[in-house]
From Swiss-Prot:
Biased composition range(s): Pro residues: 437-466
Post-translational note: Phosphorylated and activated by MTOR. Phosphorylation by PKC within the NLS in response to mitogenic stimuli causes cytoplasmic retention.
Entry-annotated residues carrying Phosphoserine: 15, 417, 423, 473
InterPro entries: AGC-kinase_C, Kinase-like_dom_sf, Pkinase_C, Prot_kinase_dom, Protein_kinase_ATP_BS, Ribosomal_S6_kinase, Ser/Thr_kinase_AS
Annotated compartments: Cytoplasm; Nucleus
Function according to Swiss-Prot or TrEMBL: Phosphorylates specifically ribosomal protein S6. Seems to act downstream of mTOR signaling in response to growth factors and nutrients to promote cell proliferation, cell growth and cell cycle progression in an alternative pathway regulated by MEAK7.
Pfam families: Pkinase, Pkinase_C
Acidic residues compositional bias, start-end: 7-21
Biased composition (Basic residues): 471-482
Protein name from the UniProt record: Ribosomal protein S6 kinase beta-2
Family as reported in the entry's similarity comment: Belongs to the protein kinase superfamily. AGC Ser/Thr protein kinase family. S6 kinase subfamily.
UniProt keyword annotations, A-Z: ATP-binding, Cytoplasm, Kinase, Nucleotide-binding, Nucleus, Phosphoprotein, Serine/threonine-protein kinase, Transferase
Source taxon at top rank: Eukaryota
Length: 482
């Protein structure tokens, strides 16, 4: 993993290969002089005219001028996310998502700077069909730019909000793709730590992509732990809350909370404020609705084990243990990885520029990248050395061997009211929480009696949480930097 944005990219001056022998005078002798001496070079050769276009050919010069702003996709405290079209250089006309971060806001805190570095490095190094791809990265005097593949299917949150709850086969598909993505991150020593519906995007074909790697932790392999308090409360594992040290098992707790959310309409532990929500996560009872199948019930309970060593996926097997659970018995994992399994929902898009799956609060705004007039100190700019990056080949490096023409299957919809959005409580990694001394260490608690079954007239499972007629603002939605 590159450190502090360090990348081995060729510059316009070229790069010298290490260990290559220097040319002798004879080797460097021009071809014309060899022929004048009556000598012909041995083997194949090619005469190359030295011009500005044939010498010092390096990575494409990339900058804001290469992109036309089309729409605003998101906005947050650190900057904006735009839909853009490339108007210069290679991939002319291609649509991307451009994340713009303000340096001045990031460098105020060392941990924000470190998390920005981590996100940049992870996006550059991790290639997987279910992880968003970085195409370019560059910077100006006051801003950082990440050019990502544009995922026009929108957030999984939007679709979950629209449906209310998912049927188990629908949830199984999304959970399986997320499992493969998490397993790949873990194999690289990376903990994701912010799994939630808002950070899961859908491609135009309907497959998931994990996004927003600002809270990831690198270099956490088997046996290592970290203690940073970060994430979104409703999906955070109890060992993060009590600060007992955590490892990659926290991602499996979050996946269990997400699974519960998909199947019931809300995360497993919620309350009217942060403190009570935390208390419930640490020592609350888990209530499972009766309409869940035995396999779904069993997997949720194994994901939400409070002891990380007893949690499914928490052992050396990691994702492989999750994949072997009976809930996924009908899943062909090789076909899933190759995009040969039909998604349960395929976004209805009119064109590459279609933003109908995004929040209209943002897409209706006029896209403007404000002037870059911030002057940072030399020491502040040192934090972003080596940020620039151009992908060796856009898309091809992660798509070899995969089929990208899945068959269209009509989505199965529920006749339930729209789900009232959860308000994720996004904490900065340095914001502390000290649990009450009365709270015990996390232990597995028995389940309460089953909830009463849905009314006989119901044609589909009902969410546990009653739908609300008013929408709550979704804190953290569209936050490009964190």
């Amino acid at each position: 993993m590159a450190a502090v944005f360090d990348l081995d990219l060729e510059t316009e001056e070229g790069s010298e290969g290490e260990g290559e022998p220097e040319l002798s005078p004879a080797d460097a002798c021009p071809l014309a002089e060899l022929r004048a001496a009556g000598l012909e070079p041995v083997g194949h050769y090619e005469e190359v005219e030295l011009t500005e276009t044939s010498v010092n050919v390096g990575p494409e010069r990339i900058g804001p001028h290469c992109f036309e702003l089309l729409r605003v996709l998101g906005k947050g405290g650190y900057g904006k996310v735009f839909q853009v079209r490339k108007v210069q250089g290679t991939n002319l006309g291609k649509i991307y998502a451009m994340k713009v971060l303000r340096k001045a806001k990031i460098v105020r805190n060392a941990k924000d700077t470190a998390h920005t570095r981590a996100e940049r490095n992870i996006l550059e190094s991790v290639k997987h069909p279910f992880i968003v791809e970085l195409a370019y990265a560059f910077q100006t005097g006051g801003k950082l730019y990440l050019i990502l593949e544009c995922l026009s299917g929108g957030e999984l949150f939007t679709h979950l909000e629209r449906e209310g709850i998912f049927l188990e086969d629908t949830a199984c598909f999304y959970l399986a793709e997320i499992t493969l993505a998490l397993g790949h991150l873990h194999s690289q020593g990376i903990i994701y730590r912010d799994l939630k519906p808002e950070n899961i995007m859908l491609s135009s074909q309907g497959h998931i992509k994990l996004t927003d790697f600002g809270l990831c932790k690198e270099s956490i392999h088997e046996g290592a732990v970290t203690h940073t308090f970060c994430g979104t409360i409703e999906y955070m594992a109890p060992e993060i809350l009590v600060r007992s040290g955590h490892n990659r098992a926290v991602d499996w707790w979050s996946l269990g909370a997400l699974m519960y959310d998909m199947l019931t309409g809300s995360p497993p532990f919620t309350a009217e404020n942060r403190k009570k929500t935390m208390d419930k996560i640490i020592r609350g009872k888990l209530a499972l609705p009766p309409y869940l199948t035995p396999d779904a019930r069993d997997l949720v309970k194994k994901f939400l084990k409070r002891n990380p060593s007893q949690r499914i996926g928490g052992g050396p097997g990691d994702a492989a243990d999750v994949q072997r659970h009976p809930f996924f018995r009908h899943m062909n994992w090789d076909d899933l990885l190759a995009w040969r399994v039909d998604p349960p929902f395929r976004p209805c898009l009119q064109s590459e520029e279609d933003v109908s799956q995004f929040d209209t609060r943002f897409t209706r705004q006029t896209p403007v990248d404000s002037p870059d007039d911030t002057a940072l100190s030399e020491s502040a700019n040192q934090a972003f050395l080596g940020f620039t990056y151009v992908a060796p080949s856009v898309l091809d490096s992660i798509k070899e061997g995969f089929s990208f023409q899945p068959k269209l299957r009509s989505p199965r919809r529920l006749n339930s009211s729209p789900r009232a959005p959860v308000s994720p409580l996004k904490f900065s990694p340095f914001e502390g929480f000290r649990p009450s001394p009365s709270l015990p260490e996390p232990t597995e608690l028995p389940l309460p009696p089953l909830l009463p079954p849905p009314p006989p007239s119901t044609t589909a499972p009902l969410p546990i949480r009653p739908p609300s007629g008013t929408k709550k603002s979704k804190r953290g939605r569209g936050r490009p930097g964190r």
